[in-house]
Amino acid sequence: MERLQKQPLTSPGSVSSSRDSSVPGSPSSIVAKMDNQVLGYKDLAAIPKDKAILDIERPDLMIYEPHFTYSLLEHVELPRSRERSLSPKSTSPPPSPEVWAESRSPGTISQASAPRTAGTPRTSLPHFHHPETTRPDSNIYKKPPIYKQRAESTGGSPQSKHPIEDLIIESSKFPAAQPPDPNQPAKIETDYWPCPPSLAVVETEWRKRKASRRGAEEEEEEEDDDSGEEMKALRERQREELSKVTSNLGKMILKEEMEKSLPIRRKTRSLPDRTPFHTSLHAGTSKSSSLPAYGRTTLSRLQSTDFSPSGSEAESPGLQNGEGQRGRMDRGNSLPCVLEQKIYPYEMLVVTNRGRTKLPPGVDRMRLERHLSAEDFSRVFSMSPEEFGKLALWKRNELKKKASLF
């Protein structure tokens, strides 16, 4: 009877639950004993941390299970009192049926209650997973990455089983999945992104390329010297063969054939400039050399009459034929006169407002002043055709209106 009246011993920070049998494991009835005081679960949060309290788990994370060390007499006398003592960081699994049978038998009361009264901690299985540590390579955190494991495993084999995956892994090591060009200077590698190559590396590369270019130029000059010697020898042979031919016609034919067989070798740096601006400039000056003096200045300024505005032809009245006339063919004139423009007296070219006057055939209605002779032109406009061509378009039109030529 002393054993029945004896209260169960608990640790200083133990949690005991007075639960109803109908509701096993209810968190609302959990209490904790500390310094001979019974504390509810809500009061545990107000306890300062410097108290000597063992680890008390939250009720929603605790495993509630009946203790298996009580006897039949305890079940009769105390039907609703159950205890559960928690040792630090330890939980107990549910007992097996054999243990239940031994604990319920009356002969095992002292044996079952003896370890409980002693208060020794119980060993239990952990509620979380531990990785296997039997093998040294079982820890996944100490293993190399997967692609390195595959590279090590397939490194000895001549052909990989997954060439596409290996190619992707290999290309992922380079920025933009492009390996660097071995001919280019290496870039500076940082933690963020590869920087441009250093100036020292660029300078050395530039010096190497410059030296290689100098060597190539020297080789080219040597080849030119060799070719010059070959040309001299070939010319000497030609002279010997020409001296053997007696007839003049045979000499001419043989000379032409030999000139065709000569290798045409020219350096690009010795060739003249062939840019469009250069050619158009030279073409403009060559064309204007055969023209009169008053038309040469405007043509050299415009360089070509094909791209001049509609009034540019009026600036050069001396363009009588040639390229200037061909440039006006695409401006709507039906039948341009390729030959020299005809000269008419001033009275035949006058335009009046009274009625539509008949102009001579083949006359340009927009440039009637070109059909005037030099004497009539100076008499009507009081200036030379060269001075008239230097005036602005609106000024020329005003003068032509006054002279009834517009």
Curated annotation (Swiss-Prot):
Domain called HP: residue spans: 338-406
Disulfide bridges in this chain: none
Pfam families, per database record: AbLIM_anchor, VHP
InterPro entries per record: AbLIM_anchor, Actin-binding_LIM, Villin_headpiece, Villin_headpiece_dom_sf
Modified residues (Phosphoserine): 16, 18, 26, 92, 96, 105, 110, 113, 157, 227, 270, 280, 290, 304, 316, 334, 373, 384, 404
GO cellular component: actin cytoskeleton; actin filament; cell projection membrane; cortical cytoskeleton; cytoplasmic vesicle; cytosol; perinuclear region of cytoplasm; plasma membrane
Cell compartment(s), UniProt: Cytoplasm; Cytoplasm, Cytosol; Cytoplasm, Perinuclear region; Cytoplasm, Cytoskeleton
Family: Belongs to the villin/gelsolin family.
Known role: Membrane-cytoskeleton-associated protein with F-actin-binding activity that induces F-actin bundles formation and stabilization. Its F-actin-bundling activity is reversibly regulated upon its phosphorylation by the cAMP-dependent protein kinase A (PKA). Binds to the erythrocyte membrane glucose transporter-1 SLC2A1/GLUT1, and hence stabilizes and attaches the spectrin-actin network to the erythrocytic plasma membrane. Plays a role in maintaining the functional integrity of PKA-activated erythrocyte shape and the membrane mechanical properties.
Domain notes: Both the N-terminal core domain and the C-terminal headpiece domain are sufficient for binding to F-actin and necessary for actin bundling activity.
Name this protein carries in UniProt: Dematin
Lineage, opening ranks: Eukaryota, Metazoa, Chordata, Craniata, Vertebrata
This protein's encoding gene: DMTN
